[in-house]
Amino acid sequence: MLKRVTQVEPGTVRRLVDLYRESMDQLARHFESPQAMEQAYEEFLTEFVTHHRQMVLVEEVDGEWVSALRCVESAPGVWFLEALETAPQARGKGWAKQLMKHTQQLLTGQGAGELFSLVSPRNTPSIATHVSCGFVATDRQPINGWGEEEPGMILYAWQSEGTPCT
């Protein structure tokens, strides 16, 4: 079931940190302690979810958050998806694909014409998920939703019916 995180309540940060454990472990070296990292993440999330055109979406199964992503409307009807990740213990069960499909339905219901994501060419599971959801690799410059170039990444795009991917 798709859930939108609309406020950072007790337990929200812990649930997301647990889900994003591998990414968080990589980020930890940039902070003086795991607690400092979690505090910074809580501050980021608290600000992020207050914006109408920014969302944290999670796929929940039997009360457990199994997959999550963030999305940002970078231009009217154009949404940037990032931080798609599935909890290690939930991988290989199709939860990321289900989350992507639910996200496509939610955002097209709000008038989205294009969704895009930047994917490392080495991240074959993410590429497979994106392709299975109708995203295609483009030749477009790998610019994220905030207008920052991310060299080495591939921009994958999905468009609603009648809007060709370029």
Q: Language-model features: where?
A:
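Acetyl-CoA-dependent GNAT
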Residues: 7, 18-83, 87-88, 100-101
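Conserved catalytic-core motifs of GNAT/GCN5-like acyltransferases
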Residues: 118-119, 131, 136-153
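Conserved acetyl-CoA-binding loop-helix of GNAT-fold acetyltransferases
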Residues: 86, 92-105, 128-132
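Active-site beta-strand termini and strand-to-loop segments that position acidic
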Residues: 60-62, 157-160
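PDZ/PDZ-like domain micro-motif
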Residues: 89-90, 145
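Conserved GNAT acetyl-CoA-binding A-motif
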Residues: 107-119
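A short beta-loop-alpha structural element at the N-terminal edge
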Residues: 1-18
